């Protein structure tokens, strides 16, 4: 592609974050076209941040439970119809690769919290053939527990700054690097505000953000060791 356009006409290459793209571009540009910078796709980078955070134990437990509940609700036509009538709509579908969508999925469950709780306690559900199944009892126990809902809300709240960054990165008008830096600073400020004195967890979240954004910034004048905005990589 660079040869077709002409190396003299190219100053920057943006690709997917796949390891094959990353390795090939870094080797090619460093060895052959030293004047050309490479950065990964910003939206894909932020999506991978959410993937990393989803591996955290407190996230993994809730995500696994919500997937189990969602699969049960969608694998039985009559049950799914009953659910949609009870909560007044449908849930956002789980997606194995779109991690931003997956937190929308969690949020769609939480938004219907009151209706789910009413449905689980209703005569319609309690007298249905689904109520005494293993998944039915699990779903009822989860939806009847305020601790479970609080845990779900915590998971959603912890990723809100990063999820907003994903929407910013995935907009039709592609942001420039200055806008990215400003959005990055906003993430850190919002995470600080949320975690407060829980400095150790704050550092872990910001480390995920920094490690993923490293490749985005490294090819610009705001990367580590560069003379502009060198302080942006401080942990907190």
Task: Give the location of each predicted region.
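A eukaryotic "domain-edge + linker/cap" signature
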Residues: 1-236
